[in-house]
Amino acid sequence: VEQVDSIIYKSCSSDSELQQILSLQQKNLPSALTEEEKSKEGFVTVVHTFEILKKMNKACPHIIAMANDKVIAYALSMHPKFGNQIEVLVPMFNEIEKLELTDFIAMGQICIDKQFRRKGVFRQLYQTMKTIVFPEFSSIVTEVDAENKRSLAAHQAIGFTDLTGYWSGSTFWKIIQLK
């Protein structure tokens, strides 16, 4: 548990926190945003069920940021064993397999409540994740829709580097890594 500017960063540890993650996710899906918001603010793509979110959390806890006892940001930890349980992520895990990467944890999704953006929360979520999952894992791997310029820039700014990219339907995905 780390506290920075009255925001607490920690592992997700309750059903209530999981529910709050899902509620923040719903607010940031493309269907909930205008075109301008999507290009300026970014968006999340995958919708998780409570059950899968809970299973993922048990295998490797999600990282959350809390302010006033509310989840205001999250980074989902996804153990590679879940690679085939979320259909839309299967292609990413197939691509990672080709690279023969070992001992990595996938970051399944990151999201920050709109009023807490541009305050260093993104960087601190990943910092907390590294503290918790290293040395068990030696890198964090994720994918970003190449159209999601805001997310790509934010990941590059904290040290993510390109591994590979692939097309899935009409979307080009960049697979990136943080060591």
Regions found by a protein language model. Give the residues of each.
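A short helix-loop-beta-strand connector motif used in the catalytic cores of GNAT acetyltransferases and
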Residues: 50-64, 80-85, 106
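Conserved catalytic-core motifs of GNAT/GCN5-like acyltransferases
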Residues: 143, 156-175
